[in-house]
Design a protein with these regions (language model features):
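Small-residue-rich segments of transmembrane alpha-helices in multi-pass membrane proteins
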Residues: 2, 42-45, 105-121
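Alpha-helical transmembrane segments
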Residues: 5-19
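Cytosolic, membrane-interface loops and tails of multi-pass inner-membrane proteins
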Residues: 22-49
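Core segments of transmembrane alpha-helices
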Residues: 53-65, 113
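Mid-chain, well-packed structural core segment of small domains
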Residues: 61-63, 68-93
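Interfacial loop-to-transmembrane junctions
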Residues: 90-114
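Juxtamembrane boundary at the C-terminal end of a transmembrane helix
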Residues: 120-132
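Short, intrinsically disordered C-terminal tails of secreted or membrane-associated proteins
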Residues: 133-139
Length: 140
């Protein structure tokens, strides 16, 4: 199976993480927050929270993305990946500008991630015939 589109979406997600990490490095320099400190300036803390939240979300997103590619399709996973990356980008830009405005980007990426997970779950783990066409109900 070829999962080139999913691989490209994965690389873009990693590029996004690299960019938010570099943003933290720049904020440390600009606002004079020396490592290992994670507090000290509001603008630095925003950049740091974006990086940490993105890392936290990637721990769930990447496995979901690849399971979707394997069990559904490469294209469907890649589309979900691009939407997730767009949501995370919107989240990052909004949070750095004004933390109260981060909701739209957060919801886009969250709903996309849940959709990827729900699709894989419904296709691979639920035993009912409705969810898994061509499969008999267990116990019959």
């Amino acid at each position: 199976m070829n999962q080139g589109f999913t691989a490209a979406a994965t690389l873009l997600a990693l590029l996004l993480y690299l960019i938010v990490s570099l943003n933290v490095m720049e904020a440390r320099r600009k606002y004079e927050v020396r490592a290992p400190a994670t507090t000290g300036n509001e603008h630095f803390e925003r950049a740091y929270r974006v990086q940490m939240n993105t890392l936290e979300q990637m721990a769930f997103f990447l496995p979901s993305l690849w399971l979707c590619a394997i069990f559904l399709s490469d294209l469907a996973a890649a589309i979900g990946g691009i939407v997730w990356i767009g949501g995370r980008t919107l989240y990052a830009l909004a949070y750095i500008h004004d933390p109260a405005s981060r909701g739209r980007g957060m919801m886009i990426s969250f709903v996309t991630q849940i959709a990827l997970e729900a699709d894989v779950f419904s296709r691979q783990t639920l035993p009912c015939c409705v969810c898994r066409p061509g499969r008999a109900v267990r116990g019959r």
